[in-house]
Design a protein with these regions (language model features):
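Arg/Lys-rich, low-complexity, intrinsically disordered basic segments
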Residues: 1-101
């Protein structure tokens, strides 16, 4: 599975929409978040706190750990990924998903 496109979400409360090569799409990220995300503020401490908090949520962990397409996965790796560039984070996640096949 591969991310093929990223656009602004048409949903009022979501920030982005990703499109996958299987014709599915997912809306994710809180629009107009007052605190922003790692791609906005570039604060590594906030990023680590977000990752720990969300990885330990029973509802989100299986999606993140097993690279299952979901809003939780895309927020974790694209908005709070290793890079402050969402496009670099897309490349990294695509590589991880390809290697996970």
């Amino acid at each position: 599975m591969k991310i093929t496109d990223l656009t602004d979400s048409p949903k009022e409360t979501k920030r982005f929409r990703v499109f996958l090569d299987n014709d599915k799409h997912y809306d994710f990220g809180l629009r107009n978040s007052k605190n922003g995300t790692y791609i906005d503020h570039k604060d590594k401490i906030k990023r680590e706190n977000y990752r720990k908090r969300h990885y330990n949520m029973k509802r989100e962990q299986p999606y993140i750990k097993n690279l299952i397409p979901s809003p939780a996965l895309f927020s974790y790796y694209l908005l709070w990924g290793d890079s402050t560039s969402i496009h670099k984070n897309i490349q990294a996640l695509n590589k991880m998903m390809h290697n996970n096949i």
